[in-house]
Regions:
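Phosphate-binding glycine-rich loop
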Residues: 30-78, 92, 102-104, 126, ...
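PLP-dependent aminotransferase-like
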Residues: 69-155, 159-164, 171
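Conserved active-site segment immediately N-terminal to the catalytic lysine
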Residues: 162-195
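Conserved core segment of the aminotransferase class I/II
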Residues: 190, 194-215
């Protein structure tokens, strides 16, 4: 017997009445772009993560790119990402003319290793780059080591974008990633912890200025 990775048809069968009613409501009011459902969803996300601003977008890849643009990264900036992650984490960086630096992962968690991160930051400086942004990636529902990453980032004056596409809603030391990061991003691709039918993404921040830039 084959078991599908994700069975949206089965899910729809279970939620059919609610989904059909929601679609009918949208068709009735006719506000297809940034309608009331979007604002309600953003408010629910914001309340769930206890974060000031939740801004939805097309997908998780766009969320990462928009986050980097909001932080005004540029040529010769070094962006630190784990070596074990989905392609999107790396592929958005060249669009900003910055350079990705890959950080080794902890063999027990597969998340970014703090010792390797510090070593890679020092290496980037020796290569003539300016350490700019760390992008830890939550993986398999497990939050990255945000406490130690935040302490290192504060010492080095580096900003943090948390990629929570594969760990949305996870906590570490009793806190969501949004409490450690300048910006957090997520994806609503169907296979993600909070998935949609199609694709979608969101950006979270407690910084009013960053939120204004993203809007």
């Amino acid at each position: 017997m084959a078991i599908e990775f994700i069975n949206l048809k089965k899910q729809y069968d279970l939620l059919r009445k609610d989904i059909d009613r929601a679609i009918k409501n949208v068709l009735s009011h006719g506000k297809y772009i940034l309608g009331p459902e979007v604002k309600e969803f953003e408010s629910d996300l914001s309340n769930f993560l206890n974060v000031k601003h939740a801004i939805t977008c097309a997908n998780g890849t766009d969320a990462l790119l928009l986050a980097l643009m909001a932080l005004d990264v540029k040529n010769k900036d070094a962006i630190f990402i784990p070596s074990f992650t989905f392609a999107s984490t790396a592929e958005v960086i060249p669009y900003t003319n910055a350079t990705p630096f890959f950080v080794d992962c902890d063999p027990d968690t597969f998340n970014m290793d703090i010792t390797s991160l510090e070593r890679t930051i020092n290496f980037s400086r020796r290569q003539g780059f300016e350490p700019s942004v760390i992008i830890p990636v939550d993986l398999f529902g497990l939050a990255a080591d945000y406490k130690n990453i935040k302490e290192l980032a504060n010492r080095e004056n580096i900003r943090i974008i948390g990629d929570s596409a594969q760990g949305f809603g996870s906590k570490i030391h009793g806190k969501y990633s949004s409490e450690f990061c300048d910006i957090v991003t997520t994806s609503f691709f169907p296979a993600k912890p909070l998935g949609c039918y199609g694709d979608g993404g969101a950006i979270f921040t407690n910084d009013n200025n960053l939120a204004d830039d993203l809007l």
